[in-house]
Amino acid sequence: MSIVVSPLISLMQDQVTALNNTVGNSIDRDGGKTDIACFLGSGQIDKTVEERVFRGEYKIVFVTPEKISFRDDEFSSSTTSSSVFMQRLQSLKTMNKIGLIAIDEAHCISQWGHDFRVSYKRLAVLRDQLPGIPIMALTATAVKHVREDISKTLKLNNPYIATNSVDRPNLRIQCHRKVDFS
């Protein structure tokens, strides 16, 4: 399974729906349809989803940084203090069920980033408690010192960094005068 950390609940819900409607909904051995992706976080209404995650029923699990970084002891500054959720992720790791952790909007990790969030800074717990699982940090807006801060925070060893030009010839802006304002 792949775990995708993202800050935007509505976007994650849209991505889960799109994945399940296109790639997902394969027929299981009992003749029913199964989803391949799910969302875990405060916006999740179905309380059985988390149990299904830990039974390995999904290929892609979208979570908020708060879900990952929450500690049962919120007053501890240690990244080794873990939540029940993190302990359950460790069990999945032990069973070789987690293949990748992807962190979207990774610029939120850096205090220098334009959308800094404390819960993102705490994602260092992933490297500490789930060693050996590849971590991919994704952002479209990180300058060099923010990328360095992301690498340092997530304890990425010799990361491959792919950058591209900000010139996007495939995008354009057009302005049209609106004559009728009604």
Predicted features along the sequence, with ranges:
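Conserved Walker A/P-loop ATP-binding site and its immediately adjacent core
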Residues: 1-23, 38-45, 64-69, 141-147
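Short, flexible loop segments at the rims of nucleotide/cofactor-binding pockets, characterized by
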Residues: 36-42, 111-115, 175-180
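Conserved RecA-like helicase motor-core motifs
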Residues: 24-44, 158-165
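Post-DEXD/H (motif II) to motif III coupling segment of the RecA-like Helicase ATP-binding lobe
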Residues: 88-163
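Hydrophobic residues at beta-strand termini and immediately following loops
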Residues: 40-41, 63, 138, 162, ...
